[in-house]
């Protein structure tokens, strides 16, 4: 019984790690491409299509600050995702929200699996 649990936990952890590494490699390249490329609708649309997201609204906000400061221009993009509905995404972090959730879930499952293994083998 302990051997079966050990084998099962190793399989689950290896699948989680490989899936998380795969997701992070894609997100890093997309985020890097966004940082290196001028922000325009074309890049954002290509990224949205590659992430299976539909651009719902493109809103550009210009904020005038104090006379000693420059104007601040912020691009806020609203994506419609089948998983999360319509939500704003900062252009620097488009595509990394899902990988963050995946990483957190992987860490939680990793701790749970090894906590159970420790309990089983410490008896």
Swiss-Prot record:
The chain crosses the membrane at residues 101-121. The keyword Lyase does not apply. Residues 1-23 form the signal peptide. Keywords: Host endoplasmic reticulum, Host membrane, Membrane, Secreted, Signal, Transmembrane, Transmembrane helix, Virulence. The keyword Transcription does not apply. Induction: Expression is up-regulated during the late plant infection stages. A motif (RxLR-dEER) lies at residues 32-65. Belongs to the RxLR effector family. Secreted effector that does not suppress pattern-triggered immunity (PTI) in plant host. The RxLR-dEER motif acts to carry the protein into the host cell cytoplasm through binding to cell surface phosphatidylinositol-3-phosphate. This is Secreted RxLR effector protein RXLR-C21. The lineage of its organism: Eukaryota, Sar, Stramenopiles, Oomycota, Peronosporales. The gene is RXLR-C21.
